[in-house]
Amino acid sequence: MNASDLIRIMQFGDSVLPVGAFTFSNGVESAIQTGVVRDVPTLKGFVLTALKQAASCDGMGVVAAHRAVVADDRDGIIRADWAVNNRKLNEESRLMATRMGKKLAEMSIHVVEHPLISWWLEQIKNGNTAGTYPVTQAVVMAAQGIGQREVVVMHQYGVAMTILSAAMRLMRVTHFDTQHILFELNHDIEKFCDIAEIGDIDQMSSYVPIVDVLAAVHVKAHVRLFSN
């Protein structure tokens, strides 16, 4: 990998990329409020569950969309996008995916200036596609020539950091704790990337009941710091 590709991965994989990720907790807010997450070990377990779910659903969508971009199959990109969106059972998850996806597309046309990204944003605005974040990420990175494995790693990192960053504001956990959790999960992320690279949208699965139960709890919560 050359330096140019590496710095693009770092730029677009940055947890402070201006796409609104800081407004979402990926479910950990409800998990902490209900006691499902209460200390470092349970936080690590929650992140691990989220990464596994992401690999078997959004991650496969990333790979399917990336392959469609490489094959210049624009219908395939849209199919992958709807497949990701349709497997998000709760409204807050759909909101997170589509809001961040549109923000990423809007930012990227000013940064990358690639015709495929302009086309993608047009499809989102016209309602021809949902514009989920995982698929938008695949479109933006594939347009820059970044490989599918690298994009899946970016997505997995984003899932983990969204949860860990939110946890810092919601519970007694230190920066050292969250960084140690992330480091320890490296081996698991490698395995989850293998799952995602199946890339078959017919095999995508988002079945993790605890996540949907926590989402339902979050909707009715009286005090909320995050949008999900």
Curated annotation (Swiss-Prot):
GO molecular function, one term: nickel cation binding
Keyword Nucleotide-binding appears in the UniProt entry: no
Keyword annotations from UniProtKB, A to Z: Chaperone, Cytoplasm, Nickel insertion, Virulence
Pfam families, A to Z: UreF
Assembly notes: UreD, UreF and UreG form a complex that acts as a GTP-hydrolysis-dependent molecular chaperone, activating the urease apoprotein by helping to assemble the nickel containing metallocenter of UreC. The UreE protein probably delivers the nickel.
General function of this protein: Required for maturation of urease via the functional incorporation of the urease nickel metallocenter. Expression of the urease operon increases the likelihood of bacterial survival by contributing to acid resistance in vitro and in vivo in BALB/c mice. Y.enterocolitica enters the body via an oral path and must survive the acidic stomach before being able to colonize the intestinal mucosa.
Protein name: Urease accessory protein UreF
